[in-house]
C-alpha cells in the first residue's frame, strides 16, 4: 500500500476509533479496565518481569492505576513515559511510588509526567526493560497497532532493540471496541507481542 494511501487509511480509522471510544460509558470503561487488570496480574509474562514500563492512562484509555499499585506491591520496578512534546522522543523514567503520580505536573494532554528538570533513572541506560505496556487507538489480532500519530512508541521500541540484548515483551491494553479486522501499517510501525482485551485468548 502506498504511503499516501496508508496515511489516509490511518486518518480515517483514527476518527472512527475516537468516535467508538467517545461512545463508551464510564461504567463500561471501568468494567473492562478491571477485567484487564485481573488478566495482567495473572499473566506469566507480568509475573516473571522485574522492570516494567506502563503508561498513565488518559480518560479514553484502559485504566492502569491498579496495575501500577500492584507493580509496587510485588516489589517490581516501575517506569513511566516522559514525552518530549516538540519531537517524537520519549524516555521511560522511574516512578518511586504509586502515590507520587498525583504530585507530578500535568501535561497539555492532562496526564501526569515528571518535569524536564526532574532527574530520574532512565530505563534504557540502567538495565533496560522486561515488559512494556502500550496504549493506542486501535489494534488487530496480529499485533498491529494504530497510535495517535506522533510515533513515540514506535521510536522508543526501535531504541529498545538497539540498547538491549533481549527485546522487551510488549503488551497492548485495549477495550474490545478498539479491536479492528486489520490495521493499516507502514515500515515504521512496530508490532506488539500481545494485545490484551476482554475476549483475548488466555496466555
Swiss-Prot record:
The lineage of its organism: Eukaryota, Metazoa, Chordata, Craniata, Vertebrata. One of its GO terms (cellular component) is mitochondrion. The modification N-acetylalanine is found at residue 2. It comes from the Eukaryota. This is 5-formyltetrahydrofolate cyclo-ligase. GO terms for molecular function: 5-formyltetrahydrofolate cyclo-ligase activity; ATP binding; folic acid binding; metal ion binding. InterPro entries: FTHF_cligase, FTHF_cligase-like_sf, NagB/RpiA_transferase-like. It comes from Mus musculus (Mouse). Belongs to the 5-formyltetrahydrofolate cyclo-ligase family.
